[in-house]
Amino acid sequence: AGVYSSDIFLRQLKKLGEGLGLGTAARIDLFEKLPVPFGLVRYGVAPDHPSIKFIASALEKTLDNPDIHLYCDVEFGKDVTLDELLERYDAVLFATGAVEDKPLGLPGADLDGVYGAAKFVEWYDGYPTGAREWPLEAEEVAVIGGGNVAMDVARELMRNADDLKERTDIPDNVYEGVKANKARVLHLFIRRGVAQAKFSVQELREMEKLPGVQLIINEDDFDLDEDTIEEAGKDKLTRQMVEELFTIREMAEDMEDDGDVDYEGNTADRKYYVHFNSAPVEVLGEDGKVVGIRVEKTETSADGKMSRTGEFEEYPVQAVYHAIGYKPATAPGIAYDERHAHLANANGDGRITTTASAEDGAQVRERLYATGWAKRGPVGLIGSTKSDALLIVTNMLEDLSKAAEGGRVAADRDPESIDRLLESRGVKPIDFAGWKKVDAFERAEGAKEGREHKKVIDPEQMRALAHA
């Protein structure tokens, strides 16, 4: 989100800057907590989605702009404060994303064997401060969630290790972990019905084509009434998703008819059950460990409202993964909207406010903005992030124009002031040239194994490479 916003800001400034009295040139300093850039694209996309990761190439072109200066390995609130930024910059934009799981909130959620999707994603994507080993001892696994992250988690738990290594940038520790994975049965539980799922068509097509995996879907879940079908048809993406699900259901029936086989008719040693209208109500445990999950059947009306039926089923599982949403990060000195899970901003326009709501007397804080998931919460994909960026940039330019008229701009105009401040604290930022050194090393390591990349996961190794 930060890179998109930087690119759009410079483009819009060239187009509108003269008319706004701002000129057409600007310097943007982009701060990143991690030693390398690209956030969600590098550390939030499933490793078997390399096509999406090609977005990083487009982002690199933006970072190669001489008007954008990258400062990786710099932590806001620790290495530099809000007041210090406001002293040096005319505007500060938060694009801090979301890295924490929303709590599961079910009885048994604290049992050994219950995992949030965010931590699992950190492991398989090689997040610099993430786990290096992951317990994959469970033979029967449950995944809770009706969106793309749940689908990613389920797919990675069912994926063959050699297949994953061949087509991705996973590091050795992830390959060895997946290779030792004992999961043979997976249950994906989705609270609402077929027409209310939030899967992309791409995710669905990847689900159906897992080598060695038999897909099993309850045909009763596809008995949709006319109102539901009509409602689903109003939205193009929903209609396409539902059509794809019906196609997958037919394919799953063929798998069952042919015995234990995958989509190509080859022997399947793993089973992947998809349960719609199934709301988990309790994680069952013995001696502090997961032994099962209790699920209540639900009914979903055409307008998406869910009702409970009072009918329960229990499934034996030894691990439960929940992908029910992320919680955007807080930022020191910035109010947080707990209800909507994002940084407090005025009516969704990206202008940071003093408190979360107008009822609390929220006032806009000059020169402070939020974009992406930090602004709107953990919803929407890259297209939404681009739309956000344009909205926020438009507001920023309008505000900067007014600020310039009133003389309300940063006091310290020296572009090297931030470098001196960080140096005085012993902070050694990694710039774009440093990132390119890390990237070159990853490409070289990947080439040794016939892959495009092999990801570096040790932050100290990243720093050594970048500063060499």
Language-model-derived ranges and their functions:
Residues 12, 58-114, 273, 281-294:
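Feature captures the FAD/FMN-dependent oxidoreductase FAD-binding
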Residues 16-33, 37, 41-43, 151, ...:
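Dinucleotide-binding/catalytic capping subdomain of oxidoreductase cores
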Residues 25-27, 35-91, 248-266:
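N-terminal Rossmann-like dinucleotide/flavin-binding domain of flavoprotein oxidoreductases
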Residues 84-91, 136-138, 307-318:
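Core beta-strand elements of the Rossmann-like FAD/NAD(P) dinucleotide-binding domain
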Residues 101-180, 342-358:
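Glycine-rich dinucleotide-binding loop and its adjacent helix/turn
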Residues 113-131, 283, 289, 301-376:
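FAD-site-proximal beta/loop scaffold in flavoenzymes
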